[in-house]
Amino acid sequence: MAKNYYDITLAMAGISQTARLVQQLAHEGQCDREAFHTSLSSLLQMDPPSTLAVFGGEERNLKMGLETLMGVLNANNKGLAAELTRYTISLMVLERKLNANKQAMNQLGERLGQLERQLAHFDLESDTIISALAGIYVDVVSPLGPRIQVTGSPAILQNPQVQAKVRAALLAGIRAAVLWQQVGGSRLQLMFSRNRLFKQAQNIVAHC
């Protein structure tokens, strides 16, 4: 069956967007607010009608992720680009471990379901919800291993609010990696279909 590279690229951009958010948070203590909102919102999309619907139905919501993906595909993998590649691959590895663990998958679904009730009282980007998302990552995803080593400013990374946002972003990255697998993504494409992914991302960015 022919691969749908549009959907694969969108899902891949979802992973890249969370990798970039983690990088921004770790180095600067803050991140692009709109991109963060898109990534967090994707965690609530349990039964989306399309790949794009997971990210709010607008290609522009993934602009940062698409640009990050293009940078990673085109880079020599040094410095910050190497960091982004490492986060991306680590999320893909963790997703495979999650997928193989039915108990963890069920627990993740239950915890995200409970979160919807909290959202009746709190904003998605409130400290309460971000802490809850971070807690889900620590309780459900982290034990599956290996741990994702986040690098950045040690002083910034000691801040509990930054730590919570990083973990919430990583959880959204796992969501995007699950989607990526569902639409036919595979790590082999990063080696053998780089040009195709790059051109597809370029085409989408052109009308963002």
Swiss-Prot record:
Keyword Ribonucleoprotein among record annotations: no
InterPro entries: HflD, HflD-like_sf
Membrane topology term: Peripheral membrane protein
One Pfam family matching this protein: DUF489
Entry keyword set: Cell inner membrane, Cell membrane, Coiled coil, Cytoplasm, Membrane
Coiled coil: 91-125
Subcellular location per the Swiss-Prot or TrEMBL entry: Cytoplasm; Cell inner membrane
Signal peptide, first to last residue: none
Source taxon at top rank: Bacteria
UniProt entry tagged with the keyword Cytoplasm: yes
GO terms under cellular component: cytoplasm; plasma membrane
SUPFAM superfamilies linked: YcfC-like (SSF101322)
NCBIfam families from the UniProt entry: PRK00218.1-2 (NF001246), PRK00218.1-4 (NF001248), PRK00218.1-5 (NF001249)
Family named by the database record: Belongs to the HflD family.
Classification via HAMAP family: HflD_protein
The protein's name: High frequency lysogenization protein HflD homolog
Biological source species: Serratia proteamaculans (strain 568)
